[in-house]
Amino acid sequence: CCVNCGQGNELDGLDERAKLSGASKLYIEDIVDDFCDNYIMPCVQAGAVYEHKYLLGTSMARPAIAKKLVEIARKENAVAICHGATGKGNDQIRFELGIKALAPDIKIIAPWRMTDVWTMQSRDDELAFCQAHGINLPFDASHSYSRDRNLWHISHEGLELEDPSNEPNYDDLLVMSTTPEKAPDKAEYVTMTFEKGVPKSINGEEMKVSDIIRKLNELGGKHGIGIIDIVENRVVGMKSRGVYETPGGTILY
């Protein structure tokens, strides 16, 4: 099961890759509007920020995904849900707490923590598996950042970012944005209306929240807004460096 939170063309080709990976059925569930209205907006209304900079793009999406996973598991009469989060990050906790809160009877399978039976222990191992099984990917090892994307943001980890002394290679890294140095020198002005902290229109044009975020992503991205490079604390006690692009969200905040 794959949940569409606004990943765009990252969903292309999933049917073929799922079949080649051994899946008998694939669900791609669109929850973009639910994600925006019921997960992003409450955080915006609360002014929620982690460690003074991070606008919680991944954190907000995981409960929404967990809810949909449980719905599909119930529909299929499944006894277990398997997720691909590693044993070092926050996602394993986010997914498993969400799943167990909604379906305490469902077993959770976490292959990355099952080192005695799961042979793939790195991104390189995964790339080798895909190559061996004819699974085409839209990137190679030289561009295999660990990324998480949805309508609100995209996060980047890995490769040169593993060494805190390295500057990010923004020319290869950025997806939604350009750097401020390459942004237009001319300012662009936006007028917005809000109702109880929820955006309702841009420049007099009423839109649903998801379309407002898309529009602000476009505007903010081309003006170099919302790029952060931070070392943050994970729940498991590790520190992790990440570069985040949140152009529309930064404008809203």
Residue map of PLM features:
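Nucleotide-activated chemistry modules centered on ATP-dependent adenylation/adenylyltransferase
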Residues: C1-Y253
